[in-house]
């Protein structure tokens, strides 16, 4: 039989297939090959009625995230708070390039809008992201229809209200929430093991644990691909390997001058590019010392 792993707990993998859930284990040959099944995996498995089954094969994954590990994700809701902590477009763009690089559709959700004296500044920023092609929403009513027919995970820095949002989406989850520490400006980690939960016509991961910004973008070409607006414009650059920094006849810099390109995003691109180049130089020095 074929199914999807929807929960992993204490060495057992719970596989959903044709409306039923089967408790399975992974055969020893997976350990020998260094393979581990993850929540989201499409698998072949064997199972008798009312007895423990076994995973026989794991299908290739289209994407993955770590800490906690989930695979084959359709979209990720990036939660950014309007206040406490303050909205940070640089941090948002770091989440977005991570998701773009992993071929996971991003949805931007702004929490704590009620703490603002005026929502206009956030809404103006939202229009910029919407012009790029991103879903940018500020209310639960806007978010819920986007969950249908999708496997969705939630991510964001500590304290933005991930657990609170998940509890509003699916109150049955009863996730523990952590209040912001005034002294640190950060929330307590209050996550638990991951599993999928059916709600609003889709599946959501019942952990708000994704706050890591680890990404393996190693060069300017990959970074360019992670910015949709740069990716579209780069086909018009004179040089195929254009980094949009110093090259002549660069379509990205031309769009910046005409106002077609949002300067904030270009500034973040340059910053991220510099970080990538610095990491590469550091790596070269380490290798040279060896």
Swiss-Prot record:
GTP binds at residues 111-114, 156-164. GO terms for molecular function: GTP binding; GTPase activity; metal ion binding; rRNA binding. Pfam families: RsgA_GTPase (PF03193), RsgA_N (PF16745). GO terms for cellular component: cytoplasm. The keyword Hydrolase applies. Belongs to the TRAFAC class YlqF/YawG GTPase family. RsgA subfamily. HAMAP family: GTPase_RsgA (MF_01820). One of several proteins that assist in the late maturation steps of the functional core of the 30S ribosomal subunit. Helps release RbfA from mature subunits. May play a role in the assembly of ribosomal proteins into the subunit. Circularly permuted GTPase that catalyzes slow GTP hydrolysis, GTPase activity is stimulated by the 30S ribosomal subunit. This is Small ribosomal subunit biogenesis GTPase RsgA. It comes from Streptococcus pyogenes serotype M3 (strain ATCC BAA-595 / MGAS315).
């Amino acid at each position: 039989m074929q199914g999807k792993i929807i929960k992993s707990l204490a060495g057992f993998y719970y596989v959903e297939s044709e409306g039923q859930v089967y408790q399975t284990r992974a055969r020893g040959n997976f350990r020998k090959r260094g393979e581990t099944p993850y929540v989201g995996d499409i698998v072949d498995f064997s199972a008798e009625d009312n007895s423990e089954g076994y995973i026989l094969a794991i299908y290739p994954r289209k994407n993955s995230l770590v800490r906690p590990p989930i695979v084959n994700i359709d979209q990720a809701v990036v939660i950014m708070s309007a206040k406490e902590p303050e909205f940070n477009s640089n941090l948002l763009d770091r989440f977005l390039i991570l998701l773009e690089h992993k071929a996971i559709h991003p949805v931007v959700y702004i929490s704590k809008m009620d703490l603002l004296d005026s929502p206009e500044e956030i809404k103006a920023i939202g229009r910029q992201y919407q012009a790029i092609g991103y879903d940018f929403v500020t209310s639960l009513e806007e978010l819920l229809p986007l969950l249908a027919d999708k496997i969705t995970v939630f991510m964001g820095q500590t304290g933005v209200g991930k657990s609170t949002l998940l509890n509003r989406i699916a109150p049955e989850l009863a996730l523990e929430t952590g209040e912001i520490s005034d002294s640190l400006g950060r929330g307590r980690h209050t996550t638990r093991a991951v599993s999928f939960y059916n709600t609003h016509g889709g599946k959501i991961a019942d952990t708000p644990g994704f706050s890591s910004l680890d990404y393996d973008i190693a060069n300017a070409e990959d970074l360019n691909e992670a910015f949709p607006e740069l990716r579209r414009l780069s086909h018009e650059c004179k040089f195929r390997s254009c980094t949009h920094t110093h090259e002549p006849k660069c379509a990205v810099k031309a769009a910046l001058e005409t106002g077609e390109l949002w300067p904030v995003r270009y500034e973040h691109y340059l910053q991220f590019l510099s970080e990538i180049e610095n990491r590469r130089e550091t790596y070269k020095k380490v290798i040279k010392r060896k």
